[in-house]
From Swiss-Prot:
Keywords, alphabetical: Endoplasmic reticulum, Membrane, Transmembrane, Transmembrane helix, Ubl conjugation pathway
Cytoplasmic side: 27-189
Family, per entry: Belongs to the CUE1 family.
Keyword Magnesium attributed: no
UniProt region (Disordered), positions on chain: 38-73, 117-138
Compartments reported by the entry: Endoplasmic reticulum membrane
GO MF annotation terms: ubiquitin binding
PROSITE patterns in UniProt: CUE, ER_TARGET
This protein's name: Coupling of ubiquitin conjugation to ER degradation protein 1
Annotated membrane topology: Single-pass membrane protein
Protein role: Component of the endoplasmic reticulum-associated protein degradation (ERAD) pathway. Recruits the soluble ubiquitin-conjugating enzyme UBC7 to the cytoplasmic face of the endoplasmic reticulum membrane where it functions in degradation of misfolded or regulated proteins localized in the endoplasmic reticulum (ER) lumen or membrane via the ubiquitin-proteasome system.
Amino acid sequence: MDSSTVLFIGAVAVAFIFLKWMVSPIPPQNEFTIDHLSQDQSTGSTTSSNAHQNRDTHSISTQSHRNSRRAVSESMIEVVQSIAPMLTVEQIRYDLETTGNVEATVNRFMELGDLPFPPGYVRPQQPPTPSEEPKKQEVIGKRSVNLLEKYNIDAKNPKSDHNSLLHQRRQEMILGARKRLAAQLSNEL
C-alpha cells in the first residue's frame, strides 16, 4: 500500500472516532433530582402488604422528610420560576421538597394551574387598589371620544370655510371614516 493510502485510512479512522465521541449522548446529571426521595418512596410504599399500614408508613416518612427539609437548590427554583413566574418561591420550594424533582413540579403546575402553599404559610395579602375603578372609567371615557367634537367638525356642513388645508383634509378623512363605518355596520345588519 502506498503511504498516502495509509495516511488517508488513518485520518478517516481518527475522524470516525472523533465524530463518534462528539455524537455520543451526554450522561444526564442529576442536578434537578433528589436521589434519596426516590429511594425512600420506592422502599416505603412497596414493602408493606397491608394497605392501611402502608399509608401510615408513607405519611410518617413524608412528614419526617418535610421536617428535615431536603436540599433544594436555587437552580431548581429558578427553572420552575422561569416557567411559572406568578408562583412564590415558598410554593415552589414546598412542592420541590414534596415531589423531589423539577419535572414533577412543573407537571403539577401545568395540571393544576397553581401549587399549594406550605402548611402554616400565610399568603401575602395584596393591598386592594382603589384606583382600579377610576382607571376603568378613564378607559371607557377615552374610548367614547367623539372625533367630531374633538376637532370641531360640523357633520351637517362638511364644506365649511376653514383657513387651513390640513384642517380640511383632516375633516374629510374623519367624515369619510364615519361614512365607511356606517356603511359597514349597515351591511353587517
